[in-house]
């Protein structure tokens, strides 16, 4: 929040027997998106879980960035009257994940793009 993205770490938990081609496809998509966002993937970790212990693959990422000098960021600094910029439907991503992971018996066409936002917000970050 409020930082120029620079680095990304990732950890994979991969189910035994997960297709290597699918893993390569995921890694290639991560590489492409990182390049588009101007971010370097600098660290990674993999663990293999037994068949049936995970649903295919779980990926956890951590992003690190640069905060412009003299700028303070943090949710605790929010106050009444501040502007909040929303880049999509509130709750869409969480709803998408829940529908993909759980069997609620609901048929809904809900997707989440998880797109990098730096290109859209960097004008706000750059000094005048």
Q: Model-derived features: where do they sit?
A:
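Helix-biased detector of long, well-ordered alpha-helical tracts
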Residues: 1-128
């Amino acid at each position: 929040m409020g930082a120029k993205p620079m680095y990304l770490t990732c950890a994979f938990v991969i189910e035994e027997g997960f297709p290597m081609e699918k893993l390569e496809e995921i890694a290639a998509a991560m590489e492409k998106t990182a390049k588009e966002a101007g971010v370097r993937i600098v660290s990674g970790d993999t663990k293999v879980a037994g068949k049936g212990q995970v649903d295919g693959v779980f990926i956890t990422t951590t992003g690190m960035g640069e905060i412009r000098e003299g700028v303070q960021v943090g949710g605790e600094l929010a106050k009444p009257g501040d502007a909040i910029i929303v880049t999509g439907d509130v709750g869409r991503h969480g709803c998408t994940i829940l529908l993909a992971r759980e069997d609620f018996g609901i048929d809904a066409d809900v997707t989440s793009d998880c797109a990098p936002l730096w290109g859209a917000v960097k004008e706000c970050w750059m000094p005048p």
